[in-house]
C-alpha cells in the first residue's frame, strides 16, 4: 500500500541520515513531531476543509524547494516526495513559494506551523489525511557549545515548539 511505502521510505531515509550525522560528528535534536499539513492560499477551494487527501490535491500544482545539485533521494525534506504528481514546481526560496501558492492555487506539504504575523492571512495550513509524521528539529556538531545568540535562538525555538 502507499502508506506502507511511505513508512518504509521514511525509515530508510532516517537510517541513511543517522549514518551521515554520525560519520560527521553531528547530532539531531528533535523539537517536536508534527502531523502532515498543506499550506495553501486562503482563496483555494480546499481552504475551508477540516482536512484534505492526496486525491483532492491532484488538480493543483505541487510546490517544493530545490534540494541543490548534490541532492540525494534520501535527503528529501518532503514527507511524501515519492508521490506521483501531474504538476510540480520547484522553487529556491520561501517568498517565491508563497507567491505561487497564492497566484497558482498551488500547495506544499508542511508541518502546519505558520506564523500569521510573519506570513499574513493569505496562507493557511490544512491537515493532510495521510499517514506519516514529520520530525522537526535542528542539527549541531556533537559537543559544541552554542554562542550566546545561538542559545537565545534555540531557547526561542524550544519555547515556540512547546506552545504550538
Residue positions per predicted region:
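Short beta-strand-to-loop elements that line the ligand-binding cleft
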Residues: 1, 64-65, 83-93
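Short, small-residue-biased leader/transition segments that mark boundaries at the very start
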Residues: 2-7
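Beta->alpha turn/N-cap motifs
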Residues: 8-18, 41-42, 93, 109-114
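Secondary-structure junction motif
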Residues: 14, 54, 58-83, 147-148
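Beta-alpha-beta core module
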Residues: 21-35, 95-145
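Flexible hinge/capping segments at coil-to-helix
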Residues: 21-36, 40-62
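Short helix-loop capping/hinge motifs at secondary-structure junctions, enriched
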Residues: 43-52, 130-132, 143-149
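Short amphipathic alpha-helical coupling segments at ligand-binding clamshell hinges
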Residues: 74, 145-159
